[in-house]
Amino acid sequence: MDYTTDNPHKLGYRMPAEWENHAATWLSWPHQKEDWPGKFQPIPWVYAEIIRHIAAHEVVKLVIPSNEHKVKIRKILQASGVLLKNVQFFVARTNRSWIRDYGPIYITAEKGHKALLDFRFNAWAKY
């Protein structure tokens, strides 16, 4: 793997639009109740509904907190009618379900060249 500190834009790379063709959608399973104070109970079911709609058309790569959680998550997904053959599970420690803050950021250039950004999210400022 090559590593560079050069500006990706100057090298001809760009971040693809969300509507462009892609291999999969990455999501992270919600598990931090503090993100939804007093409202967490329906959140896993809401995520399952989102996954159901996406997995009907493409692969979902789902980050989960542990293999122990996988059994419960699969039950929720099954009960929601998710096409499980299109869901791939990846165990990784996370502190939030907002994968855009810490997940892989793919960029692309002409002629099919692809790269990953080493993006370091350092949390939200106070708002």
Language-model features: where?
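The feature marks the mature, well-folded catalytic cores of soluble enzymes
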Residues: 1-127
